UniProtKB/Swiss-Prot annotation:
Belongs to the RNase HII family. One of its GO terms (biological process) is DNA replication, removal of RNA primer. Its main location: cytoplasm. Endonuclease that specifically degrades the RNA of RNA-DNA hybrids. GO terms for molecular function: manganese ion binding; RNA binding; RNA-DNA hybrid ribonuclease activity. It is found in: Cytoplasm. GO terms for cellular component: cytoplasm; ribonuclease H2 complex. Keywords: Cytoplasm, Endonuclease, Hydrolase, Manganese, Metal-binding, Nuclease. It comes from Paramagnetospirillum magneticum (strain ATCC 700264 / AMB-1) (Magnetospirillum magneticum). Its EC number is 3.1.26.4. This is Ribonuclease HII.
Length: 201
């Protein structure tokens, strides 16, 4: 389970940053930056926060409602157009920088999930598997996941055939079948091979 050991080791104001949505065929990539206040963290968050991929949808949503009361949050996203123009890695870094900027605070350090730094105005420590190690990164992973899932559910209302409210834009059989039958929507990443093969022009 993640804890605050890295945050305490570094000291000062530390934010955790994570993203969701690098792999999907549709929708934006979304990042969150979170500064936790250790003195105000409820036991519920300390005991239940984990890598968002290990939590049920219900647990993620419950935790995402609790985090803002004891944290400073910043969100950033990179659009489908930006993903197609600058590639998914650079778009991920862009979303992370936007999330950091949205905090409105200068941090002594940022803990970033992954092995490549996004280029921030403060020192960065990359933590592979960070959402299972750092509580700040875990919080960022949960709130980013819940936010992006809600965005994809909204987009699904206009394009119900793709099942985005269930698959969040990932290349499930349902999604790929609809893509083959109907072709890409404006929300698809045209630079991704499974989408590009169904483009008419």
């Amino acid at each position: 389970m993640p804890d605050l050991a890295l945050e305490f080791e570094i000291g000062g104001i530390v934010c955790g940053i994570d993203e969701v949505g690098r792999g999907p065929l549709a929708g934006p990539v979304v990042a969150a930056a979170v500064i936790l206040d250790p003195a105000r963290l409820p036991k519920t968050l300390l005991e239940r926060l984990d890598d968002s991929k290990k939590l049920s949808k219900r647990n993620r949503e419950e935790l995402a409602e609790l985090v803002p009361a004891t944290a400073i949050l910043g969100f950033g996203e990179a659009s489908v157009e930006e993903i197609d123009r600058i590639n998914i890695l650079q778009a991920t870094f862009l979303a992370m920088r936007r999330a950091y900027d949205a905090l409105g605070r200068e941090c002594a350090h940022a803990l970033v999930d992954g092995n490549r730094p996004p280029g921030l105005p403060c020192p960065v420590r990359c933590v592979v598997g960070g959402d299972g190690i750092s509580l700040s990164i875990a919080a960022a992973s949960v709130v980013a996941k819940v936010r992006r899932d809600a965005m994809m559910a909204d987009l699904a209302r206009a394009h119900p055939e793709f099942g985005w409210e269930r698959n969040a834009g990932y290349g499930t059989a349902e999604h790929l079948d609809a893509l083959k039958r109907l072709g890409p929507t404006p929300h698809h990443r045209r630079s991704f091979a499974p989408v590009a093969q169904y483009m008419l022009f």
